[in-house]
Amino acid sequence: MGRKKIQITRIQDERNRQVTFTKRKFGLMKKAYELSVLCDCEIALIVFNSTNKLFQYASTDMDKVLLKYTEYNEPHESRTNNDIMEALNRKEGNQGGGNSDDESPGPSTSPVIQITMPAVVNGHSSNNSVASAASASAAAVAAAAAAVAAVEGTSSGAAAAAAALQASNAQRHHNLNLYQNLIFNPNYTRHLNQRNDPLSSTSVAPSSSSSKHLDFPPSTSFAYDTSRLHPIAAADADCDLVPSSRAAADQNIWSSALQQRPVSQPAPSISNSSTNGISNGTSSLLSPNVSSLNGHSVLDLGGPNLPYKLDPNTYVKMEPHSPPEKRPRITTEWRPQQLT
């Protein structure tokens, strides 16, 4: 059943005519605004009612738009009521009474391609669902390209486009499986390294040249044996690691070390310096006790009893793996300087 055709004639009632004018005028300005925004154009709308009242609308500025109007002598398009009536009648006859505002058919719409996303389980998508989604998207894109090319009349181009899309999607599918195996399958990297052994063997050569420049290894990279150190260095190295039960063993080490050393000269006697302005307490500190251990002179500096004794005539260098005879000892006798 066709739609009833509406006759556009003058409204006889004055009140109804004013109401219709107000509504249609606002609708006309609204359409002009939409046209100016959507199509980026300038519009000047001038309306006089039945009592010669002026109503105007301009998208930017009326004077600027009218100035552009006066600059053009020949308008690109000019229509009157008769032209519009003919267009409306022709449109209603073709479309069966349609009331669409646009005369153009609008942009052509291509078939909608719907791609199903893979289901996510516990924050991770399964390999089968991702692979099926990739293959489905590849087939859909290839079909769409073939359909568009067929519409344009290029069958050979459609086949070439479909083949290219299938090749690219196959490579993408291969890369997708590789990434998923690297992320979700820890054992995959081991097999991947076994397959890429020729590549790894070729990369060994440049790394061997750079191995010549080695930094000092950390202390945790090798076992630190203090048995070959000098006794004092060994005691310093083991001070935080050796329990109190090894105090006797340390003293035995010192005894054996002192027995292996040659007999040194006795320490020079230090005269009493109290006559030089030094108190007796200070002179007692400057005149240490000299005792003997296994036939060797040993200097006793006082204070708490240490697990070992110091030999005053022996030069000991506090460095690991460094012999005591690295630098010569000053053998000349020294005397404390007098205070003036």
Swiss-Prot record:
Interacts with histone deacetylase hda-4 isoform b. Transcription regulator. Binds specifically to the MEF2 element, 5'-[TC]TA[AT][AT][AT][AT]TA[AG]-3' in the regulatory elements of target genes, such as chemoreceptors str-1 and srh-234. Involved in transduction of sensory signals, together with egl-4, kin-29 and hda-4; binding to histone deacetylase hda-4 enables negative modulation of chemoreceptor gene expression in chemosensory neurons. In response to starvation, negatively modulates expression of chemoreceptor srh-234 in ADL sensory neurons, acting in concert with basic helix-loop-helix (bHLH) transcription factors. Pfam families: SRF-TF. Belongs to the MEF2 family. Keywords: DNA-binding, Nucleus, Transcription, Transcription regulation. Residues 1-61 form the MADS-box domain. GO terms for biological process: cell differentiation; negative regulation of transcription by RNA polymerase II; positive regulation of transcription by RNA polymerase II; receptor guanylyl cyclase signaling pathway; regulation of acetylcholine secretion, neurotransmission; response to starvation; signal transduction. Changing residue 38 to F: In oy63; Suppresses several phenotypes in a Ser/Thr kinase kin-29 mutant background; dauer pheromone hypersensitivity, reduced chemoreceptor gene expression and also decreased body length. PROSITE patterns: MADS_BOX_1, MADS_BOX_2. Induction: Down-regulated by microRNA mir-1. Up-regulated in many head neurons during prolonged starvation. Residues 90-112, 193-217, 258-283, 312-340 are annotated as: Disordered. Residues 200-211, 269-283 have a biased composition (Low complexity). It comes from the Eukaryota. The keyword Transmembrane helix does not apply. The keyword ATP-binding does not apply. Residues 318-332 have a biased composition (Basic and acidic residues). This is MEF2 transcription factor homolog. It comes from Caenorhabditis elegans. GO terms for cellular component: nucleus. One of its GO terms (molecular function) is RNA polymerase II cis-regulatory region sequence-specific DNA binding. PANTHER family: MADS BOX PROTEIN, MYOCYTE-SPECIFIC ENHANCER FACTOR 2. InterPro entries: MEF2-like_N, TF_MADSbox, TF_MADSbox_sf. Residues 258-268 have a biased composition (Polar residues). It is found in: Nucleus.
